Amino acid sequence: MVDISRELQVAISTGKVVMGFKEVKKTILTSTPKLVILAANAPKWAKEDVEYYAKLAGVPVFIFPGSSIELGAAAKRPHKIMALAVIDPGQSEILKLVEHA
């Protein structure tokens, strides 16, 4: 099983990750990220919006099994993160989340 927190930190430090609802939505519309991660407590409207555009773009969506506070902590950020998009996973194996989901 993939350690989500560790792989997320590796992806942030060695790859390219975009954080925040607006930035993730913009990334899905303008380019194709490899993976979108949503916090489990994301508002319904935000979750539906991101999932809709991700489905149109063929991007897998992973629901992080924790709150936006926990997702922020997993990313080693001092704030909440509702959504993030992995554009380049770098040396991480975060894309294996899709295989296990």
Swiss-Prot record:
InterPro entries named among the record's database cross-references: Ribosomal_eL30 (IPR000231), Ribosomal_eL30-like (IPR039109), Ribosomal_eL30-like_sf (IPR029064), Ribosomal_eL30_CS (IPR022991), Ribosomal_eL8/eL30/eS12/Gad45 (IPR004038)
GO CC term (a single one): cytosolic large ribosomal subunit
Any GO molecular function: RNA binding
Single biological process term from Gene Ontology: translation
Record's keyword terms, sorted: Ribonucleoprotein, Ribosomal protein
Keyword Thylakoid among record annotations: no
PROSITE patterns linked: RIBOSOMAL_L30E_2 (PS00993)
Disulfide pattern: none
NCBIfam families given in the database record: PRK01018.1 (NF002172)
Alphabetical list of PANTHER family matching this protein: RIBOSOMAL PROTEIN L30
Family statement: Belongs to the eukaryotic ribosomal protein eL30 family.
Protein name: Large ribosomal subunit protein eL30
Organism this protein belongs to: Pyrobaculum islandicum (strain DSM 4184 / JCM 9189 / GEO3)
Gene (name only): rpl30e
